[in-house]
Amino acid sequence: AMEALKGTKRESTTFGKVDVVVYPGVMLVNNVTYKLYKAAFELQPAVEMQLWKGASLRLQVCLPIVNNEPGKWDCIRLGYLTLRQEFRLDNHWKGYLTGGNFSDDRQGLAAGIGYFSSDGRWTVEGEGGITGSSHLYGNDWGMSKWKRVNGQLSVGYFIPQVNTQLKVSGGRFIYGDYGVCGILSRYFGEYVVGLYGMYTDGETNAGFHFSIPLPGKKRSRHAVRVMLPDYFAFQYDMRSGNEFARRALGVSYRTEPKSAENSRFWQPDYIRYCLIRTNEKTKLK
């Protein structure tokens, strides 16, 4: 498909055009004994800009709306503050390099590379980074040296008959523990639901995740657009027992919002399935 596009005349470009994306943020955790749940809801607007080919800039701030947990959730603070470069090495290889302020109060450098089979069903991916802590609560911005090294290797397979993706990964988390994780994700059109399980340093964890499409995908390309993200994604961690949380096991970070990752799900069998479904619905009208 990429070869067929070579030499095609460019109709428009996203260079220099700005998106103001208003991400909803939800926190729901039950790893404390003094209340049933820690919960928070906030808006996380981000200024996003496409630079040169494969490069993007994201500047995000987190605005608290309501919560039942004092501390960071009461403060206006930085979200993602990143410069990201994506690249394609060959038809089957792609990767990224990014630096800046990530999720989970981390900042540093991270990189990843992945191999994708010809039919897109098999994937082998590796990623890692070196980070330090980054806390900006009110007027106090605390940072530490970049000394925490993490990395993981994952293998995934997409089962087209049931539109399900299986992924198994293993590696080193932020605070030095090693573990493995298995994820099962089922796709229903643009909706995704899934389960995961993790084992690290003698402790277990599990949970579920889902992703739902948000309205407003049909947009005109103006110099500045204000919009919602394409998807709202959420993951709930069970964290069995207090030991998992006390020892900060299985802690990782994201270099971009989860909904941004969902927007790039390009598995060929799944795209074909969605196109066939769309065509069938059109014929019935």
What are these language model-derived features?
Residues 1-9, 123, 143-144, 150, ...:
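Flexible, glycine-rich linker and terminal segments associated
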Residues 1-83, 144, 277-285:
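Outer-membrane beta-barrel initiation region
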Residues 10-19, 52-58, 88-94, 118-124, ...:
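Short loop/turn motifs that connect adjacent beta-strands in outer-membrane beta-barrel proteins
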Residues 20-33, 57-67, 83-85, 90-102, ...:
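Transmembrane beta-strand segments that form the barrel wall of outer-membrane beta-barrel proteins
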Residues 31-40, 51-53, 65-78, 99-109, ...:
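Solvent-exposed loop/turn segments connecting transmembrane beta-strands
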Residues 41-52, 75-89, 109-128, 149-159, ...:
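Feature captures outer-membrane beta-barrel proteins of Gram-negative bacteria and organelles
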